Amino acid sequence: MRIMKYLILCGVVVCFVAATAMAQTPNRGDVGQPWNNYMAFASDNAPAPPPATATQPEEKKSDAAADEEKKDDSASGDEDKAPEPKRLIGQLGCTKINITGWLDGGGTINGDSPASRYNGTLAPNDRNEFQFNQLYTVIERPLKIDDCHPWDIGGRVDLLYGTDYIYTESLGFETHPDGSPKWNSGIDYGLAMPQAYVDIGYDKFDLKIGRFYTILGYESMMAISNFFYSMNYTLRYAEPTTHTGGLLTYKKSDELSLYVGGVNGQDETDGVVDSFGVITGFNWTPKDQKYALNFAIMTGCLDPTTADPNIYAPRTEFSTYLTYNFTKKWQSVSQVDAGWQQNYDLAGDTADYWSFTQYLFYTINDCWKAGLRYDLFNDDQGTKLGGLRFGGLPGGNPLPLPSGDAGAVQSISAGLNWTPNPNFRLRPEVRWDWYGGHGVPLFDDETKNSQFTVACDGIIQF
C-alpha cells in the first residue's frame, strides 16, 4: 500500500500536467465553479442547470463535487441560479485548472465552562473558545465532455489547515500506518489533504482514482456544504470521511447516477493491516426535483476490533437520506444510518449501531434561512461513541479514548444562515445535547450527561 500511495500521488501530478497540455481554450463564461454552490442552497435553493448540448459542452464534476451539488440542487425552489462567489484566483489562464477555497472560523460558548475547554461530543467546534477551523484550498481540473470530445482527464487536490484536520486524516498518509503523528505534532492545528485523485471521464462514465470523500451521508467535512456549524453524530462517529482506492460513477440519466468502488477500508491509505472494502450506491432525483433519494453501502474488513487494533473484522454500514421540498421555502431532509461489525471483542460478539437525523429548513428570503436538526446516535456496545479529542490536555493530563460509552446520545440544534453576498456566510446556532447510556458521562469533563452550547462561525470564500 505504500507503493500504491506514491503511485497515486505521482499519478495526480502527471495527470494535472497532461490536462494542462490538453487544454486549448478557456472555459468561457465561468464566474465560479458549480462544485461549491451551497450559496444556491442557502438562497431559495436553485435548481440544477439544464443538460449539456453539443454546442455547449458539459463540464463534468468530480463525484464528490457532484454529490455536494446534488444536495443543493435537490433543494430547488427558484428558477434562477444563485450568483457565484467572486474568486481571488479562479481559472489559471487557458489551463482549465481552477484554484478556489474558503476560510472558516468560529467560537462556542459552553454553559458548563469545562476546565479542559473541551465540548465533549461536539465537532468540529469541540473547544469552548474561538477556533480557526478551515483554511481550505481546492486545485481542480474538471472534466469537460461533449460529442466531439467523448473522453477527458482531470483531477483534484484539496488542502485543509486548521483544527478540523483531525477529522480528515488518513492512516499512512498524514499519519504513520500505526496512527502515530507524521505531518502534525500538535492536537489543535494541523494540515491534511483529504482529496488527491485523478479523474478519467468517458461519455457517461467517470472513474476517480486516489483519495476522495466518501459517498455515505448527508453532511460533509467541507464547511461550505453544511447548514450548521456543528456536525451530526453520524458523521462524527459512524461514517467514514475519506477512502483511498477507485470509484466509478455511471450517469444513466439526468435523474439517476450509480456508484461502485473498491477502497482500502475507511480513512486509511496505508495501515498496519490493509483491507479491501466495497462501496456502492445511487442518487435519484426526478425531473421536477420535488425530492431526491440517496443510498450508499460499504462493506469489508474496515475497522480494527476492540480486542486487538491489528485485527480487522468484517463490517457493513449503509446510509440513506431523502430530501423533500414541500414548497419553495420549506424543505425536509431525513437520514438513517446503520452498521454492524463482527468479532468486535474477544468473545466474538457482533456490535451494532444506528442513527437517525431529521432536518427542517425554511428560506426566509435571499439572505436568511432558518434550520432545525434532531440527531440520535445509538451505540449499544460502545464501539464508536466517546467524548474528547485524541491527544493530551495542557499540563500532560491524558484524554480518554474516543470510544467506549455504550448507549444513546441525542441533540437538538436550531440555527440561522445569513448570506449578505455570495462570498460570505454567517452561521449562528444553539444546541442541546444529552446522553442516556450507562458509560462515563460525556460532558463537562466527564461529569455531566447533558450540555447547552451557543456557537457561531463565518465562512469567507475566495
Regions from the language model: what does each represent?
Residues T95, N128-L135, Y189-P194, D203, ...:
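Residues that define the transmembrane beta-barrel architecture of outer-membrane proteins
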Residues D30, T121-P124, Y165-T168, K182-G186, ...:
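Outer-membrane beta-barrel pore domains
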Residues G93-K96, T108-F132, G437-T447:
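Surface-exposed strand-loop-strand hairpins of Gram-negative outer-membrane beta-barrel proteins
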Residues P83-I99, L143-I153, K204, L216, ...:
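Short loop/turn motifs that connect adjacent beta-strands in outer-membrane beta-barrel proteins
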Residues N98, P124-T163:
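Glycine- and aromatic-enriched membrane insertion/assembly motifs of diderm outer-membrane
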Residues D112-R127, Q131, D164-W284, A292-C301, ...:
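Surface-exposed coil loops of outer-membrane beta-barrel proteins
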Residues G101, F132-R141, Q195-I200, I209, ...:
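Residues on the lipid-exposed face of transmembrane beta-strands in outer-membrane beta-barrel proteins
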Residues C10, F16, A21-G120:
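N-terminal periplasmic/intermembrane-space "pro-region" immediately following the signal or transit peptide
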